[in-house]
Amino acid sequence: RGLGDVYKRQFGSYWFETGTPTYLVNLLKKHHYDLERMAHEETDEQVLNSIDSESSNPIPVIYQSGYLTIKGYDERFGIYRLGFPNREVEEGFVRFLLPYYANVNKVESPFEIQKFVREVESGDYNSFFRRLQSFFADTGYDVIREQELHYENVLFIVFKLVGFYTKVEYHTSEGRIDLVLQTD
């Protein structure tokens, strides 16, 4: 890190900033990957060791790039449980995704998240939902066929960055809840 960071006593997401994952984001979008799954993906050794540009599974590339790590292993079935190595990597990755999934540019992205947080904290839900709708305003025609997953991914990114526990497509004995948010 530079001396400016030491002087300001701010270190940011150094690990994340050193490797821009644009290729990975494009891979996730190309294969319509459900982002919520990434934090608890399960797979086997064969998948982890396979990198094929034609594969519809982006997980091996993301794992081998270091954005996911092994969190557990089930010896009986040979299944690995993956997740982000730490909060810094997860937050950096999710922040990087926002401009690629929502109608917001990279410069405005951090300010939009601050506005979301302030609106929730102040109880200004009308402004919150107007801002959220603007994130979907320019959804391209190519996204329409995978529209539900696109919306789930945008909501997951926004609410994750706001600091909510987010669970997409939560299954209960009575059916499915599209999105669960928990503030505490």
Residues of each region from the PLM?
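A short, conserved structural fragment
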Residues: 65-73
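Active-site metal-binding core of divalent-cation-utilizing nuclease and nuclease-like domains
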Residues: 158-183
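Short, small-residue-biased leader/transition segments that mark boundaries at the very start
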Residues: 2-7
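Conserved helicase/translocase motor-coupling segment
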Residues: 8-61
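Short, amphipathic alpha-helical interaction segments positioned at domain boundaries
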Residues: 83-114
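A short, highly charged nucleic-acid-interacting micro-segment common to nuclease
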Residues: 45-51, 136-151
